[in-house]
Amino acid sequence: MNAYLKIAVLMLLLSASGVARASLSCTLPGGVSLNFGNYDDTSTSNTDVSTTFTVSCCRNPPGSNDTLSVALGPSTNSTAANRITTRQMKNTVNADRMTYQLYSGSFGGTIWGDGVIGGSVVTQAISTNTNCPGSTVFTVNSAIFGRIAPQQAVSAGTYSDSLTISILP
């Protein structure tokens, strides 16, 4: 059977755990979504998609260089013991789960996680030349790379998951 699955948007909950460094303040304006589109469970190819997101930072006084670590938290829908190394989207009408993964740098590269439970954080040097409450906008990493492995035996439907992005000094 050739079941095409409408993969719901994977929402990366950007309730960013704000940076707690003395005078540095960072936020994630808006949300980030990763839409895998239709999934063909008979295909022998991975389903790969990517997206970027931006972070806004300001500092009092401005003009400093900082290094931030960006962590992606565990899957809220995974039933695995390690919800980072085994992320799962859940069917919105039944108990089916579809395994996927998020990477930094490239598809199938380093798992983007929290550096504690699993995966690695992404570190980025920034220059904050804007005094608070203004902001300097920069792009964190070039992309989040998402991959669904081929030939997963799941029912047709809409699948979704959410996780939290944390920005750490």
Please give the residue ranges for each predicted region:
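Sec-dependent signal peptide recognition
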Residues: N2-L10, R21
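N-terminal signal peptide c-region/cleavage motif recognized by signal peptidases
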Residues: S15-A20
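Extended, solvent-exposed segments with strong compositional bias
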Residues: G105-S135
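N-terminal small/polar-rich segments of proteins
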Residues: R21-A95, T128-P169
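Predominantly extracellular/luminal cell-surface or secreted proteins
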Residues: A71-S75, Q101-G105, G113-G115
